[in-house]
Amino acid sequence: RDEVMMQLPVDDTAVDRADDALVGISFHVPRDAEDFPECDAELPASKALYDRLKPYTLDDGAGDVVASFDQVGVLVPRGRFDVEMYSSSFHLLGQAHDFRVQYSSILRIFVLPKANSPQTVVAVALDPPLRRGQTTYMMVLCQFPTEEETTIELQVSDEHLAKLNDKGAKLSKTMTGTSPDVFAKALRGLSGAKLTRTGAFRDSIGEEHAVRCTYKNDDGYLYPLEKAFFYLVKPPMLIPYDD
């Protein structure tokens, strides 16, 4: 990677949303940059710049990785990412871009089996949204093979695990099941966010949890949930019944 992205804190309660605000700075660092004499094939210039900036960044208390999932297909923001879950945030690590999501910004987690597809989407609703440049992402959509089995070992102490479970996390040191289920349960347990699954609704054939529909020029699927509709896929939208 030849890019270092610096994210800046934004107070959404104090900034007039109509005004421009600096939310990030992206540095392009050529691999042969002469300002970093310590760089070589093992240490590219972008990593050298990152190492110099790291001591001046705000520590989010990430600590060690608690759980990780390799090469997850992500629909929004699009790409394949390694997902690392920490005690206070989870990170999306891709070939071109990385993202960090604070658990405090997660509104709710949804598990949505895709219609006419052997895939299941785990949707993470955010406020404030993820930002990259002028693009914002109100949702993170992670996609998994529905029947794929996986096992993870949570890297947490027994004491910390007990504290999480006292708050309703329902976690165990070893978690086994289908990939979307394990991912959603681990994220729910670590973040404390509520988890919503599809209910009793079925289509006219009695097979799918959603109905096909059109939004503007794109085809998608509408999931009738307990308190809202969820529209998948462009753009993903949560539509409360009260609205």
Which residues make up each language-model segment?
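N-terminal recruitment modules of adaptor/scaffold proteins
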Residues: 5-99, 113, 121, 125-243
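Short C-terminal beta-strands that terminate individual repeats in beta-propeller domains
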Residues: 102-103
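Short, conserved beta-turn/loop elements at beta-strand boundaries and strand-helix junctions
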Residues: 110-116
